[in-house]
Amino acid sequence: MNDIAHNLAQVRDKISGAAARCGRAPEEVTLLAVSKTKPASAIEEAIAAGQRAFGENYVQEGVEKINHFQQAGVSGLQWHFIGPLQSNKSRLVAEHFDWCHTVDRLPLYRSPLKVLIQINISDEQSKSGIPLEALDGLAAEIAELPHLELRGLMAIPAPESEYVRQFAVARQMAVAFARLKTRYPTVDTLSLGMSDDMEAAIAAGSTMVRIGTAIFGARDYSK
C-alpha cells in the first residue's frame, strides 16, 4: 500500500470512528480529498485507492487537472471548487467543476452547477462568506435560478483547539443547515470539518469533510 492509499485508509477510519461515536453511519459523511498544489500523479494514486471526490482551491490549476483526467478517459470523478470565488473566474468554475462550495453572492454565470453557500461563521475579515443572518435572502435568490442547484452550506471556522468550542461553532452551522433543508428539497450537504476539527464537525452533523495534508502530505506553494 502506497503512502496516499495508507493515508486515505487512516482518514476513512477516523471518519468511521467519529461517526460511530455519535450514532451516525460512516456513509453519511463524504470525504472530499483536497488536492490543491498536488500533481495529477498524486490524484491518480488516490483514485486507485477508491477516492472519487476532489477539492481544488485554484481555478486554473483545477481546470488543468479536470481536463487531464477527462482526456485520459477517467470517469466517475467529482470536482469541487472550494477556493474564493472571483467574479472573473466564475464562468470557468461553472463550466468545469461539478460543485462550488464558496458562493457568497448571486452568481452571474448560466452554466449548471451544484452550489453551497459559504457562511463566515467566525466573522473573520480575512475569509469569504456571508453572515448567517443574510442566508435566507441569498438562498431565496439562488433557488430562483434554474441552472443552479442549491445543495447546502459550507464554512471554515476560525481555528479552535478545544473540542467543546469546535462543537459549539459547528452546531451553529448544523442548525442553519437543518432549517435550510426544511425550505429547499435539494439541500443535503453541510461541508464542514478539516483535519483538526473533523470529529466535532461530524458530531454536530457535517455531511462532508475536507481533508488535504493528511492524505497527500505537506503542500508545496513554491511551484
Model features per residue range: what roles?
Residues 1-196, 204:
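Conserved alpha/beta-domain cores
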